[in-house]
Amino acid sequence: MKYEAVIGLEVHAELLTESKIFCGCTTKFGGEPNTHVCPVCLGLPGTLPVLNKKVVEYAVRAGLALNCTIANFSKMDRKNYFYPDLPKAYQISQYDLPLCSNGYVEIEVDGKVKKIGIKRIHIEEDAGKLLHENTDGSLVDYNRAGVPLIEIVSEPDMSTPEEAYQYLTKLKSILEYTEVSDCKMQEGSLRVDTNVSVRPVGSTELGTKIELKNLNSFRAVQKALEYEIKRQIKVLEEGGTIVQETRRWNEAKGITEPMRTKEEAHDYRYFPEPDLVPIIVTDEWKEEIRKSLPEMPHRKRERFISEYGLPEYDAKIITSSKKIADFFEKCALEYDSPKAVSNWLMGEFSRLMNETGKEIDEVPVTPQMLVKLLKLIDNGVISGSIAKTVFEEMFGTGKEPEVIVEEKGLKQIANEDELREIIKKVIAENPKSVEDYKNGKEKAMGFLVGQVMKATKGKANPQLTNQILKEELSK
């Protein structure tokens, strides 16, 4: 029997408001433990919450960008459970009347477009953070308690780990473009829970659902799903049954492990939050927010293709991140070869960002600096290969490219007489390759060019090198 997977995702995104959802405490990441707190977010007796209007606005922005219906009337609810990181012993969330519902995003997998439904988006407060650094017990940091979140719940419309990965990538891109969240998984501002089950191909009944946690990257989501789908199919093929539970992804072992049996919604004893009035979103306010939405990724991609002549692949990669798209456009306005800019962004820039774990706005290289580097290549001051060395130094130090070229003596050798002397020496030292070239072996030319580059430490002008080599070899 063949099986297929059914996947749904729950994404929690911290909102980029300056203050928390029900009080005036800062939402800044990285403060000393328990310094961004007050009686309200600590849930002390006698305190009352006041809903931050910006939270509603940002949630509506996200909802509109994700093609949702925005509720004119919604309310907050108490979700009751006890855990040390939850100071009130309940979380203020939304239950039966979410702010946004019935949305969708379109993803592209294997050249085909698929629509993934979004069941709901609701607002809620974040919990604190448990720190297990001490063997004698755990510590709680309440700085995060009360930070505003939106929870985006997809329909179970995904059937492969690749679809889940593409959905998350698209969702992150839209949240960044709307400036609703910075989506930094390493800081916990984007968190993903995955629900997955398997069923016989062609069946309409859903299988037993497993929730996966501890997923700290989109690739981890993909790997965890790949493993979990295989595990569930194996259990069923061996005549076993799937137990509804929450499982943890163990990155080191590459497996999922049981955490706890899955709670149902009624375990939380939801009831309306008595200390907050209902949320009213008027049509006028909704329209005002809609008009403030920026250019979305798919529109920007189309524009980059038509306006800058980028290939579709380049435009898709560049526009997947708002920060990279903005960087590209600043370069393209100052430099007349947009394709060269995209090559650098997708090549050396991307490689070094991946190696260092930095985002483009955390790197000391500005668009103006990259343009200067490209112009140094165009003007024959440095070669393309030397430019990579210069760029690495720029990336690490923030120095201007011309300063690095001067300091390290990297200027290209473009003096014909100087280069001819070096080439004559290379020819004299490699008679076998010279003979091979004269006998029609084109590869020998590549070897000789390489020897010239080696002798000049990569500083020989490539075009001039080829020209002089051919002249000398024809003598």
Swiss-Prot record:
GO terms for molecular function: asparaginyl-tRNA synthase (glutamine-hydrolyzing) activity; ATP binding; glutaminyl-tRNA synthase (glutamine-hydrolyzing) activity. It comes from the Bacteria. It catalyses: L-glutamyl-tRNA(Gln) + L-glutamine + ATP + H2O = L-glutaminyl-tRNA(Gln) + L-glutamate + ADP + phosphate + H(+); L-aspartyl-tRNA(Asn) + L-glutamine + ATP + H2O = L-asparaginyl-tRNA(Asn) + L-glutamate + ADP + phosphate + 2 H(+). Keywords: ATP-binding, Ligase, Nucleotide-binding, Protein biosynthesis. Gene3D superfamilies: 1.10.10.410, GatB domain, N-terminal subdomain. Its EC number is 6.3.5.-. SMART domains: GatB_Yqey. Pfam families: GatB_N, GatB_Yqey. PROSITE patterns: GATB (PS01234). Allows the formation of correctly charged Asn-tRNA(Asn) or Gln-tRNA(Gln) through the transamidation of misacylated Asp-tRNA(Asn) or Glu-tRNA(Gln) in organisms which lack either or both of asparaginyl-tRNA or glutaminyl-tRNA synthetases. The reaction takes place in the presence of glutamine and ATP through an activated phospho-Asp-tRNA(Asn) or phospho-Glu-tRNA(Gln). PANTHER family: GLUTAMYL-TRNA GLN AMIDOTRANSFERASE SUBUNIT B MITOCHONDRIAL AND PROKARYOTIC PET112-RELATED, GLUTAMYL-TRNA(GLN) AMIDOTRANSFERASE SUBUNIT B, MITOCHONDRIAL. Belongs to the GatB/GatE family. GatB subfamily. NCBIfam families: gatB, PRK05477.1-2, PRK05477.1-4, PRK05477.1-5. HAMAP family: GatB. This is Aspartyl/glutamyl-tRNA(Asn/Gln) amidotransferase subunit B. It comes from Thermoanaerobacter sp. (strain X514). The lineage of its organism: Bacteria, Bacillati, Bacillota, Clostridia, Thermoanaerobacterales. The gene is gatB.
